[in-house]
């Protein structure tokens, strides 16, 4: 019993040390929002949307914009600019779009890439491929295919698939 308790305490201490190290790395505001990381987030945020006029304006003074954002964040004076809201009709279906400004996308990307994803992804199941690097559409399709084949081997054609559609989920989330 003493050996088990000692082993439990050692493992508990190791888990706590690992958690403390992660908190030091991902929980420090100045580290997460360092100029270098904000600039990397800016580069990632403009990838694929360089044709937009707002992105081109931001890119024209990118160093000044990233520096200003960094200074506001460190000083505690950064404020969200809110959303651009507009309506479109896509494949005959009207949609209400809420889009954030490129400068806000940079901050969100920095927070996600250097804090939230590293901290939270350790608790995700392997099969979660939602917006994780290296786990895109092909990963999700291969996992579903594998699970369906496994189910078919065990149970034949008996069974069912549940499909959930979250309608207006973004509208119900608190944005303040």
Residue map of PLM features:
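Non-catalytic, polymerase-adjacent accessory regions of viral genome-replication enzymes
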Residues: 1-67
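Active-site-proximal segment of RNA-dependent polymerases
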Residues: 25-28, 112-174
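Non-catalytic, well-ordered alpha-helical scaffold segments
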Residues: 36-39, 63, 67, 104-109, ...
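Intrinsically disordered or highly flexible coil/loop and linker segments, enriched in small
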Residues: 38, 51, 75-79, 153-154
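An acidic intrinsically disordered interaction segment
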Residues: 67-84
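Short, solvent-exposed loop/edge-beta patches enriched in aromatic
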Residues: 77, 103-105, 115-119
């Amino acid at each position: 019993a003493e050996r088990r308790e000692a082993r439990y305490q050692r493992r508990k201490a190791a888990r706590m040390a690992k958690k403390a190290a992660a908190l030091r790395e991902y929980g420090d505001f100045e580290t997460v929002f360092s100029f270098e990381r904000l600039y990397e987030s800016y580069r990632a945020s403009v990838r694929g949307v360089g044709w937009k006029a707002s992105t081109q304006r931001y890119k024209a003074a990118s160093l000044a914009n990233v520096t200003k954002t960094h200074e506001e964040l460190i000083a505690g004076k950064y404020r969200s600019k809110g959303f651009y809201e507009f309506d479109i009709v896509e494949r005959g279906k009207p949609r209400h779009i809420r889009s954030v400004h490129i400068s806000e996308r940079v901050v969100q990307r920095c927070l996600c890439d250097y804090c939230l994803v590293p901290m939270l992804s350790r608790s995700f199941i392997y099969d979660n491929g939602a917006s994780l690097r290296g786990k895109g559409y092909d990963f999700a399709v291969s996992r579903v295919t594998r699970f369906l084949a496994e189910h078919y081997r065990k149970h034949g054609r008996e069974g069912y698939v549940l499909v959930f559609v979250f309608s207006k989920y973004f509208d119900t989330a608190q944005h303040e």
